Amino acid sequence: MKRIVVALLLLPILCMALSGCDFWMDGQYVSVEPYSEQNFRPEKDMIEVSSSAQLRQAVVDLVESGARSGIISVASFNDATVHFYMEGAIRNVTQNNPIGAYAVDSITYEIGVYSGVDAVALTIHYRYDGDQVMHIKSAQTVGEAEDHVYAALEKFEPSVAVLIQEYQQTDFEYLVQEYAAKNPDIVIETPRVEANLYPEKGQQRVVELVFTYQTSRENLRQMQELVAPVFTSAELYVQPDAQLREKYVQLYNFLMERFDYSLETTITPAYSLLHEGVGDCTAFATVYAAMCRKAGLECHVVSGTREGEPWSWNLIYFMGNYFHVDLLFCSQTGGFAASLGSEMTDYEWDHSAYPSR
């Protein structure tokens, strides 16, 4: 992202006859427009600094508070070093500070006199809006940051930014896909994910995830509301005193008897399957697994091949063993059937990726 550092040294303009301005250069205004307190937030009093380190920190503090402007005393610096230290402070906050690297587009400044003291007046330009700084989430680790990502997915937010204190390399696209697969009732459509890191290196970083959906946010919310009661009904459909295998059968019957399904891939698998009777093997497997988990049953989605073609099915647990269940195969052959791994002769999958006996 291009950063612009601009030092504006305006021509002197006589303004002794004007009022409402106390930022001067050699007794004159440094800006054509009157430079008055009304251009700054009330809390933006002049910041006192006496070293380059304090100057850098003052600029960081302004950015991290979401300020759009600020005035910093530079009385301790001579004219030859003010520009050097200011440009260094701006480079530091826009290139090394996580929040500055993420949020700031450019910083401009003027040098003059404020209330009789040599000072610098900064104007901070943000990528979107200064308020975005206040919306940055905070997490110590990537694991804690995941909760913020999941919350954004559940609300179909267009993006989320998290300041992570101890960042570790993470595949956020896979993280989103995995959460969506386990929660088809919540993540109605799996978005395309763009992950950006600010800065590019360092332990402390802002992670920005941008989500792109094909379906409107309003429609996704409506679909989510329509899907939720179906999952609740499925959970209630399971008899508490039934044997484990029978509970799996009950959920199979609940799902498979809803429609005469049409096999088709959609971008809203849970909604399309449960309200339109349209879905593919992955939609059946993910929805069934989610229903099982809500009912307290262990159930996994297995990705592999069936007769050489990409396929998804389920892995369930009862009677001390893991069994494979292909819902679509069951529907074609007359009912629920659970098979041991050794009996899945037409299927191939990574055995090490899934639990076994």
Name every feature range the model reports, one short phrase each:
Residues R3-W24:
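Sec-dependent N-terminal signal peptides of Gram-positive bacterial secreted proteins and lipoproteins
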Residues L18, Y271-S272, Y317, N321:
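Eukaryotic intrinsically disordered, low-complexity regions
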Residues G20-P240, S352-R357:
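N-terminal accessory/pre-domain segments preceding catalytic cores
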Residues T215-L274:
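Secondary-structure boundary elements
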Residues E246, D346-R357:
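A short, charged
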Residues L273-T282:
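Periplasmic OmpA-like peptidoglycan-binding domain that tethers envelope proteins to the cell wall
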Residues A283-D350:
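Hydrophobic/aromatic-rich core segments of domains that either
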